[in-house]
């Protein structure tokens, strides 16, 4: 069973549900209804593409509640209005033939009128349906009715309706204090049945101070965060960040923010971006990769990021290299990839700093370095192609071989990115197992040749520069060294191109090559 205590499994459940696995869809709906609201589901689930979603939403009150919660999310109300109309029409036809309804159906009817979903907002019907569900102890209706009253309590006509419905048995005049006491009671009833939204409302509604102390408010906020409400996780996370970074609460704050950010909470994502940017100097690879990860997952920042940088990161790398390693002739492609990823991260950091400091001009030296960086990428591809070491983005592999390469990449820590999407096997050349063996042999030859030419020494020096914290003063040195490295690589390529091609054709002429 999936709960918010093992919420990481929810993402697996969402993936299976989106692939139209019926059991996963049923379980995801059940978990969503039980938790009353899960931000990650609203962010990543695609119920409008599920098979039989209209029929299920008409017949099953759990599915109805589930799909109604998507109505106000992003542009769903406009994008899927035809689907919603079919559901609402079918639902009202079904209930017109039913002699009795369950609590969740009454709640759903109140929600439909409340949010004007193909039914004109009639306040009396909203209150009436919610009250019927509340009388059946629906935690969803308890929360929804409390919220509806809280948003409208100041209107005289609304108070008159309350006197005929919610407060029909009351002998006292209806005052603001009495109204908020009722709101508080409804929230507490809902929270006691596990409703993170109600728990959060108990902790944040200012008018409840007469009924609840700060200690209890904090308790409800923590409970709501533990139960998976992203806004509560964000609130606690930012609250804990006020202390020293080594403080235990600070580290807990990071965990809360990450849990919220994973669900798609923009505020948490932006907070993490800023935190890892400031912490850059302490750990170049960990912190900048973290910053980039949340940057690329932050919907609000993605378009902004694309306008600042020419492309998304080509490589994000968690692997380190050791020039004192006992391993003879470490793989030069791995070394080069790691160093180039560091250089690009330096560029990202510098440009990010310029943006955050409201700097209008990004200096020519940065553009020059970025230009040289991409020329290095091109040079590396030329080397690999010249020796028939097919770069993974230029070949299509049978599934088993493709998976083998991906597994190997996962072991090395190198994850290729191009334009913010993982390599897509649909664009690759089709080759077989023999070709993989050929590539391995030729890569060893290339590796040995480049070591023999002492080209790799430049890479070690580059890596040392990238490790230094005062990277601003090292930009020019890195730029010059990159140019030196590139010129040597190109010279090496030109000198060896014919020899290496002849070697390939002579030894492996039985292999058919299908170039684009």
UniProtKB/Swiss-Prot annotation:
Key word Membrane present: no
Signal peptide residues on this chain, from the entry's feature table: none
Listed GO biological process terms: ERAD pathway
Keyword annotations from UniProtKB, A to Z: Repeat
UniProt KW Repeat keyword: yes
Residue ranges of Sel1-like repeats: 103-138, 230-265
Entries under Gene3D superfamilies matching the protein: Tetratricopeptide repeat domain (1.25.40.10)
Recorded superkingdom: Viruses
PANTHER family: SEL-1-LIKE PROTEIN, SEL1L ADAPTOR SUBUNIT OF ERAD E3 UBIQUITIN LIGASE
The protein, known as: Putative sel1-like repeat-containing protein R850
Organism this protein belongs to: Acanthamoeba polyphaga mimivirus (APMV)
């Amino acid at each position: 069973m999936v709960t918010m205590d093992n919420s990481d499994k929810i993402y697996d459940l969402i993936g299976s549900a989106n692939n139209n696995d019926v059991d996963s869809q049923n379980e995801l709906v059940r978990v969503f209804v039980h938790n009353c609201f899960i931000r990650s589901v609203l962010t990543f689930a695609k119920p409008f593409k599920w098979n039989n979603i209209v029929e299920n939403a008409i017949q099953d009150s759990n599915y109805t509640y589930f799909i109604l919660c998507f109505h106000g999310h992003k542009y769903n109300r406009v994008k899927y209005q035809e689907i919603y109309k079919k559901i609402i029409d079918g639902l009202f036809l079904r209930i017109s033939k039913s002699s009795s309804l369950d609590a969740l159906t009454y709640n759903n009817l109140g929600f439909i009128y409340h949010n004007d979903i193909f039914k004109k907002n009639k306040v009396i019907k909203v209150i009436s349906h919610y009250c019927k569900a509340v009388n059946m102890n629906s935690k969803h209706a308890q929360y929804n009715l409390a919220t509806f009253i809280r948003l409208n309590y100041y209107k005289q006509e609304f108070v008159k309706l309350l006197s005929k419905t919610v407060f029909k048995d009351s002998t006292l005049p209806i005052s603001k204090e009495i109204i908020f006491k009722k709101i508080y009671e409804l929230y507490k009833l809902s929270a006691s049945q596990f409703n993170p939204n109600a728990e959060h409302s108990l902790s944040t509604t200012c008018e409840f101070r007469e009924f609840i102390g700060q200690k209890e408010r904090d308790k409800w906020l923590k409970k709501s965060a533990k139960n998976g409400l992203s806004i509560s996780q964000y609130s606690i996370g930012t609250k804990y960040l006020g202390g020293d970074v080594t403080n235990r609460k600070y580290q807990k704050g990071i965990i809360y923010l990450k849990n919220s950010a994973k669900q798609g909470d923009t505020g948490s994502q932006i907070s993490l971006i800023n935190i890892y940017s400031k912490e850059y100097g302490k750990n170049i690879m960990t912190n900048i990769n973290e910053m980039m990860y949340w940057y690329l997952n932050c919907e609000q920042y993605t378009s902004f990021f694309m306008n600042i940088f020419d492309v998304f990161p080509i490589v994000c790398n968690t692997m380190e290299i050791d020039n004192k390693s006992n391993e003879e002739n470490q793989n030069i492609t791995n070394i080069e990839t790691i160093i180039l990823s560091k250089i690009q991260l330096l560029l990202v950091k510098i440009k990010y700093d310029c943006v955050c400091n409201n700097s209008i001009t990004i200096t020519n030296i940065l553009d020059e370095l970025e230009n040289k960086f991409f020329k290095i990428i091109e040079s590396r591809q030329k080397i690999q192609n010249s020796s028939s070491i097919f770069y993974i983005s230029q070949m299509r592999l049978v599934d088993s071989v493709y998976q083998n390469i991906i597994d190997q990449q996962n072991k090395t820590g190198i994850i290729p990115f191009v334009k913010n999407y993982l390599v897509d096997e649909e664009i690759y050349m089709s080759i077989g197992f023999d070709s993989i063996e050929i590539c391995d042999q030729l890569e060893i030859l290339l590796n040995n040749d480049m070591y023999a030419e002492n080209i790799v020494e430049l890479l070690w020096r580059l890596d040392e520069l990238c490790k230094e914290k005062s990277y601003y003063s090292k930009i020019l040195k890195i730029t010059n060294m990159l140019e030196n490295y590139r010129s040597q690589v190109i010279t090496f390529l030109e000198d060896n191109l014919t020899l290496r091609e002849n070697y390939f054709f002579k030894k492996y002429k039985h292999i058919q090559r299908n170039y684009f």
